[in-house]
Regions:
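Primarily a LysM-type cell-wall glycan-binding module
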Residues: 454-491, 496-509
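Interfacial loop/beta elements and low-complexity acidic/Ser/Thr-rich segments
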Residues: 1-460
Length: 511
């Protein structure tokens, strides 16, 4: 006879894969005929984008493009600095253990290293190390037993736990082409030297069957001015974006985990508009939305019958019951003396955090490594541009509660604000890092489709036993093995605390 069960269905994530995979990509950039010959390379900025990926067994194929901004010197009477922008597609296959077809994957690429050379005045050789931040999630359909709907007594070990029950996961691409105006204080453009773009000010609003996501693309542009080819300026603009993502069954209990990744971005002068203060921007943003509910569930963790033989087959799956994220802000200040050449002006600066390594030990997160700060300088006499990279030592620690042996924890460095001020040949560097520590609570769930109730063969059960406690034993395991109850063991052996028994302790068992 089958035993009736009341079950609670759950959709959970399995333990996520979070890996940084580095890959070197080489590219030769040919200076077009419309540009003057290159005499020296000042700086090369590489911005990688992933537009598509294909998950295979043990590997992933990524496709996208690399945007190159080159600042170089020229030998010309009118000017000495020029800029060059080129974009090239790429396709790479990355090795990723435990990856399987059908997994949900997001990839956020960053450029970690750049090696460049000038074989001749019309050719620039660039070799860049791209670090692909790969996050893989796989969902599992699971369930837990709430109770048994039968007349016979069944001993149950109950557990109360909070689950992040996934209702729906959906990825959408926001793509747009629009004109943006530069602020009034910006001068007319002659040539763009460098662009940095990142997402900020994100928020969402929910409605009956959809959510509206929106935010800004913070764009920083370094450019040569139209009036003077030696004058280098910096301007920042915000490009707003928004989109509707359709979801089903949104309720008051619904919570959302939303991730944004820029898949493509470009900005250039609009040739159809006479003013040089109007730019045309094209962008593509991937937004990944996971809708879930926090369900507190009391369920049967283990069970047995003292008088019947319950036969069943079970499948054990490891899943993430819930994910807790802690946010920490770390501020770093460093004064560096005599670091700049004399007669130089600091025009721009940028921060690279890919050389900072997080380590998790017990309930402590330690950040070690260097924050690399890139400085764009201009000589006040020759007007020549130069680039200098300095290292700022990072050695920070902070405590995080909730990390255990059955947790999977990983750290993300997302906020990377920097401010550099110049005082002669000295600089003051202020760095603000926003750190997310994600803790996944892992759980092993025993999935049972059906339970068959049979007659118990008592011929192999002794009426009295003396059991010597071994390492890892609990009263529950002993009671289940000998078809008795915890209450009977406690009373027979005068046990004060049923949760505490000692190795070597003798337990009298009477059926």
């Amino acid at each position: 006879m089958l035993v009736n069960m009341q079950k609670k269905s759950l959709v959970l994530n399995k333990c996520s894969i979070n890996e940084n995979i580095s890959d070197w990509i080489e590219q030769d950039i040919i200076v077009p005929d419309s540009k003057p010959d290159a005499v020296k390379i000042v700086n090369v900025t590489v911005t990688p984008y992933v537009t598509d990926c294909e998950v295979m067994d043990g590997k992933v194929k990524v496709m996208g493009k690399l945007n190159y901004f080159v600042i170089y010197r020229v030998n010309d009477e009118g000017f000495c600095n020029r800029g060059l922008f080129m974009s090239y597609p790429y396709s790479e296959v990355l090795t990723l253990e435990n990856a399987r077809s059908g997994m949900n994957m997001t990839i956020d690429p960053k450029c970690k290293n750049i090696i460049f050379s000038l074989p001749n005045e019309r050719k620039i050789a660039v070799k860049s190390e791209i670090m692909f931040k790969v996050k893989v999630k796989e969902q599992v359909n699971a369930y837990v037993i709430k109770n048994f709907d039968c007349d016979m007594p069944i001993e149950c070990k109950m557990c109360n736990k909070t689950f992040n029950n996934i209702i729906q996961n959906k990825s959408s691409v926001i793509a747009s082409k629009e004109d943006v105006m530069l602020p009034k204080e910006a001068e007319d453009f002659f040539e763009i030297l460098k662009i940095e773009a990142k997402i900020k000010n994100t928020e969402y609003k929910e409605s009956y069957n959809k959510i509206m996501v929106k935010g800004d693309i913070d764009v920083k542009i370094i450019y040569l001015t139209e009036n003077s080819t030696e004058d280098v300026k910096r301007v920042s603009i915000d490009v707003p974006f928004s989109a509707m993502v359709e979801l089903g069954n949104i309720s008051d209990k619904s919570k959302f985990d939303i991730k944004y990744i820029i898949q493509d971005f470009s900005i250039k002068l609009n040739p159809d508009i006479t003013t040089t203060k109007t730019l045309t921007t094209e962008y593509q943003i991937m937004v990944d939305v996971t809708m879930y509910e926090e369900d507190e569930v009391e369920y049967v963790e283990d069970f047995y019958s003292q008088n019947r033989e319950l036969k069943y087959e079970e499948e054990t799956v490891e899943a993430v019951s819930k994910t807790v994220t802690f946010t920490n802000n770390i501020d770093i200040k460093e004064n560096i003396t005599n670091i700049l050449p004399a007669n130089s002006n600091l025009l721009d600066y940028s921060l690279d955090t890919s050389y900072i390594t997080p380590k998790i030990t017990n309930n402590m997160v330690e950040l070690e490594g260097n924050a690399k700060v890139s400085l764009l300088l201009q000589d006040r006499e020759t007007m020549e541009l130069d680039n200098k990279i300095i290292d700022v030592l990072v050695n920070q620690k902070y405590d995080v509660d909730g990390i255990s042996e059955i947790s999977n924890a990983y750290v993300e460095i997302t906020g990377d604000n920097i401010e550099v001020t110049q005082n002669g040949t000295d600089i003051e560097v202020r760095i603000s890092l926003q750190i997310y520590t994600n803790i996944e609570d892992l759980i092993n769930l025993n999935l049972i489709d059906s339970i068959e109730d049979n007659i118990l063969d008592i011929s192999n059960l002794d009426s009295i036993n003396i059991y010597v406690v071994k390492a890892g034993d609990t009263l529950w395991n002993i009671a289940k093995k000998y078809k008795t109850s915890i209450d009977k063991l406690v009373k027979t052996n005068d046990i004060q605390n049923p949760d505490v028994i000692d190795v070597g302790q003798k337990i009298l068992i009477i059926r």
